[in-house]
């Protein structure tokens, strides 16, 4: 726990970004980037999130780490005021339950004079299902600030969440996207999700888009955005050029 606390305090993390592309020809969308994180180890090695995030979660330190990430991005945006982009950050379960987190976001944005629409907070379906009350409060508060909210790993079984909570984006589960060319049932699910989202004014993002053929099929279906190795691999945030 001490090691994790020290890493957060000292900022011993490297942020990465992965491009999320608008895939509809008529779209005039701003640039979107998913923010990913690695932890510095000795000898300049980087630990992937699967190695350290479970520990951060176990020690209930995710809200502190999420604050560090928000603050880092806000400072970067403050130094690059010409940038018109949306950065997508995954919000941990404990952060959803943290009543002080939305006011922390507001304070950071106001101090640095950064537009709230620069942030899209991503909530996992499982976390939303098991914490509906907390998710509802969190999404209402950050959307009131002007931030965006995305519901991740979405499948048709999660559609009842849309009756209770307002979202700006739905991220279609990558396991469906991977099979879109092989499995008619998964294709039908994606079509259903896309129609359901658009009917309620929500835009869709397909994750794990690996090939041009999958991308072409998603365009045909009418999905709005795509993310994955077929669009672009994760790159160090410090190298981001817009």
Regions found by a protein language model. Give the residues of each.
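C-di-GMP signaling machinery
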Residues: 1-14, 56-60, 95, 101-102, ...
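Active-site core of bacterial EAL-family cyclic-dinucleotide phosphodiesterase domains
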Residues: 1-55, 122, 151, 227, ...
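Catalytic core of bacterial c-di-GMP phosphodiesterases, primarily the EAL and HD-GYP domains
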Residues: 25, 30-34, 59-134, 148, ...
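Conserved long alpha-helical elements within nucleotide-processing catalytic cores of c-di-GMP signaling
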Residues: 50-54, 63, 140
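EAL-family c-di-GMP phosphodiesterase catalytic domain
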Residues: 42-43, 92-97, 118-131, 145-242
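Charged helix-capping and loop-helix junction motifs
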Residues: 103-107, 134-137, 184-191
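A short beta-strand signature of PAS-family and PAS-like sensory folds
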Residues: 18-20, 89, 210
